[in-house]
Design a protein with these regions (language model features):
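Active-site bordering "gate/hinge" segments
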Residues: 1-262, 399-401, 409-411
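Short, glycine-/Ser/Thr-/acidic-enriched flexible segments
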Residues: 35, 104-106, 149, 218, ...
Length: 411
């Protein structure tokens, strides 16, 4: 697949028809940067062609975003105007589907005051609570895709002097992860979904009470709440329409018990958070909460993340991804969680998805917390798996059943 236009057309088709699954008469909201415009034009046109009534493009520019972060005061930078909240809520209440196209450099905000970035994250989390609820409970459809910016491509391919070639290489790598390089991408996705669904069914039938992770620098037991549900690729919104939240996706996931996580865990891939890289970090848990942490890179940013709110020091999501997966086998480090989380077992600090608990979407926040489902304004995945990781599922009677051996499925 050498033709640039053909690549973008096929990618747009996968995003619109499989990821977002745009319905006739539906509104579409696209979040993107100016770097992604070549793809955004294609996605916008196709969305209209399949029947979208309105395609709202929320465009930002990385250079301007960096300047705002550098020169605005913390108070100005972290302020979320009411009109922005009202605009998003109006779309949410009218069955909008969100398409997020990631392009920004993982280092975009390197050197910016961590407290300023943390204040924006906290204020945005509180301001967009309705949005978070609609997304976490699948009321609205949403999908996340990506498009390579020059800065991001240079980070992934540091030895490539020609920026255009680096971007082309990254685009080709991205397209492989979302199966656009296949003769029939739709069929390829159907087969992939079925494989992940079978893994989820096995785990649901076992009904483990906890998982025990062991590898170099990791010895962690994560409790699983009563009535938890393992979820594979693919969701349904409130109107019954299918959608695929992450493109790519290789994970099977559920909620962790917010009060039953003990031991220590170390990251195996860098974490890009708030335009900064956090790497070589270790978290120690007791009774579900991070009680100690260290990081060789990005310590202050990690501290801001953990201090976002009470729930940001607890586990919301538990996700299983084999080391023998397409993204992992590519040998590339994307410095982008959307990709790196799909190359590795991972956990998420912060909010759990109510969809991973029986009747969870019908519960209040208080009821979810009583059911040991974590609540937070944040949800940040970090990668912990490698080729040496073993995972045992623990049954109620204490019996241990192999789930992963040497980084891959044991069943």
């Amino acid at each position: 697949m050498n033709n640039f236009e053909e690549k973008l057309n096929k990618y747009a088709e996968v995003i619109v028809k499989i990821g977002a699954n745009v319905q006739k008469g539906q509104k579409v909201w696209i979040n993107c940067t100016t770097d992604a415009l070549p793809l955004v034009y294609k996605v916008t046109e196709l969305a209209y062609q399949v029947g979208a009534s309105d395609v709202h493009v929320k465009l930002t520019d990385d250079k301007l975003s960096r300047l705002h972060a550098e020169y605005q005061s913390k108070e100005v930078y972290s302020h979320i105007p009411q009109w922005a909240i009202d605009e998003r809520n109006d779309y949410l209440d009218n069955n909008v589907v969100f398409i997020h196209i990631l392009s920004s450099s993982p280092n975009l905000f390197a050197g910016i005051d961590a407290e300023k970035l943390g204040a924006l994250t906290k204020n945005a989390g509180e301001a967009y609570k309705h949005y978070r609820t609609c997304i976490m409970t699948d009321i609205n459809s949403w999908t996340i895709a990506s498009y390579p910016s020059a800065d991001w491509a240079k980070l992934v391919f540091p030895d490539e002097e020609n920026t255009d070639i680096a971007q082309e290489k990254l685009l080709d790598a991205i397209l492989k992860t979302v199966r656009v390089d296949k003769a029939d991408p739709v069929k390829a996705w159907e087969e992939h979904r079925q494989n992940l669904t079978e893994k989820a069914e096995f785990l649901n039938n076992k009904n483990f009470v906890a998982l025990h992770y062991t590898s170099k620098d990791t010895d962690l037991t994560v409790g699983l709440p009563k009535n938890h549900i393992w979820v594979a690729a693919g969701c349904k919104n409130a109107k019954g329409a299918d959608f695929l939240p992450n493109m790519p996706t290789e994970e099977v996931f559920t909620a962790g018990d917010r009060d039953r996580v003990d031991g220590y865990v170390s990251n195996k891939k860098p974490l890009s958070y708030q335009g900064n890289i956090i790497d070589n970090f270790k978290l120690t848990f007791k009774d579900g909460k991070v009680v100690d942490f260290e990081a060789e890179q990005g310590y202050e940013i990690l501290k801001q993340l953990l201090d976002t709110d009470e729930g940001s020091r607890r586990i919301g999501e538990v996700a299983l991804v084999p080391n023998d997966s397409p993204i992992s086998n590519s040998g590339l480090l994307y410095y982008q969680t959307l990709f790196d989380e799909n190359a590795s077992n991972h956990l998420a600090l912060g909010a759990a998805y109510p969809t991973t608990l029986k009747d969870g979407t019908k519960m209040t926040e208080e009821e979810l917390e009583k059911a040991h489902i974590n609540q937070s304004i944040s949800h940040v995945d970090f990668m912990i798996g490698d080729a040496e990781m073993d995972i045992d599922g623990i049954l109620e009677d204490g019996t241990k059943i192999p789930v992963f051996r040497k980084g891959n499925w044991a069943f």
